[in-house]
UniProtKB/Swiss-Prot annotation:
Main location: cytoplasm
Organism: Enterococcus faecalis (strain ATCC 700802 / V583)
Residues engaged in binding dUMP: R22, R177, R178, R217, S218, A219, D220, N228, H258, L259, Y260
InterPro entries xref list: Thymidate_synth/dCMP_Mease (IPR045097), Thymidate_synth/dCMP_Mease_dom (IPR023451), Thymidate_synth/dCMP_Mease_sf (IPR036926), Thymidylate_synthase (IPR000398), Thymidylate_synthase_AS (IPR020940)
Entry keywords, A to Z: Cytoplasm, Methyltransferase, Nucleotide biosynthesis, Transferase
Name of the protein described by the UniProt record: Thymidylate synthase
Catalytic activity: dUMP + (6R)-5,10-methylene-5,6,7,8-tetrahydrofolate = 7,8-dihydrofolate + dTMP
Family that this chain belongs to: Belongs to the thymidylate synthase family. Bacterial-type ThyA subfamily.
Quaternary state and interactors: Homodimer.
Length: 315
């Protein structure tokens, strides 16, 4: 099944259109692509490079809690959302440190600046962890995924828990074609640190199996997509566990599927590696609800990947 992902990387390298992008990095992209993963045949955590499952778990649990503040993530040594919160802070009047303009590019090109950035970033993370008032102001990312999944605000000021509603519908009306959760809220997009890349997902029940399809408007193929595949596969497993279903397929539909210019060599290296068997996901059988799970309740067994391939993140 990993071949589905590798085929996407190969296709972009061979056929991708060069495009400028919001980050100024430049990408090779395709529009409209779909991959399918049979979750009964193994948990789709890529093996052609190590994918940090602990980060995937803590991010998904963060979403499930409806949380949008990076403090929860930092407490679990998860730094994948740091840059977007840090960017908001260094653009504020409260920031008095060295100039951090365009830090995402400068840190790759200027070793002296990279040291400055590392120091300021560490100060920022320490402040988030140790100062609740600072964390409330600068750890917040706006109404991103968790808020939309669990607390979608309506025009009358009430809130919709989309995810809880969908889980209940899977139990009571599994043939419904409305088993949908959307993270794309046009009213909130301007105030989000990063508008949702994975925008909407839908569940489908057939012959006692739960399948999930994700529509992802923007797909960072080398860094982001391996996380997204594993995250939504895990979400499908968790909901199947609560609803008493087996797992079916994870269907991943991509809008703008892109490979950043500075990820080309890394993708080529990954494509040169031999695929290994997917691991097995193990969930704590004593936990009944999706919302009761914690880090120690979710494990993978038999994960034997090739080494990590590092690549810069585009902010």
């Amino acid at each position: 099944m990993e071949e589905a992902y590798l085929a996407l990387g190969k296709k972009i390298l061979e056929e991708g259109h060069f495009k400028e992008d919001r980050t100024g990095t430049g990408t090779y992209s395709l529009f409209g692509y779909q991959m399918r993963f049979d979750l009964a045949k193994g948990f789709p955590l890529l093996t052609t490079k190590r994918v940090p499952f602990g980060l995937i778990k803590s991010e998904l649990l963060w979403f499930l809690k409806g949380d949008t503040n990076i403090r929860y993530l930092l407490e679990r040594n998860n730094h994948i959302w740091d840059e977007w919160a840090f960017e908001r802070y260094v653009k504020s009047a409260d920031y008095q440190g060295p100039d951090m303009t365009d830090f995402g590019h400068r840190v790759l090109q200027d070793p002296a600046f990279a040291e400055q950035y590392k120091e300021e970033h560490q100060k920022f993370c320490d402040a988030i962890l140790n100062d609740a008032e600072f964390a409330e102001k600068y750890g917040e990312l706006g109404n991103i995924y968790g808020a939309q999944w669990r607390h979608w605000e309506t025009k009358d000021g009430s809130f919709i828990d989309q995810l809880a509603n969908v889980i209940e519908m899977i139990k009571t009306n599994p043939d419904s074609r409305r088993l949908i959760v959307s993270a794309w809220n046009p009213e909130d997009v301007p105030s989000m640190a990063l508008p949702p890349c994975h925008t909407m997902f839908q569940f489908y029940v057939n012959e006692g199996k739960l399948s999930c399809q994700l529509y992802q408007r923007s797909a960072d193929v080398f860094l982001g997509v391996p996380f997204n595949i594993a995250s939504y596969a895990l979400l499908t497993h968790l909901i199947a566990h609560e609803t008493g279903l087996e797992v079916g397929e994870f269907v991943h539909t991509l809008g703008d599927a892109h490979l950043y210019q500075n990820h080309v060599e890394q993708m080529q290296e990954q494509l040169s590696r031999e695929v290994r068997s997917f691991p097995t996901l193990v969930l704590n059988p004593d936990k009944a609800s999706v919302f009761d799970f914690d880090m120690e309740d979710i494990k993978v067994e038999g994960y034997d990947p090739h080494p990590t391939i590092k690549a810069p993140i585009a902010v």
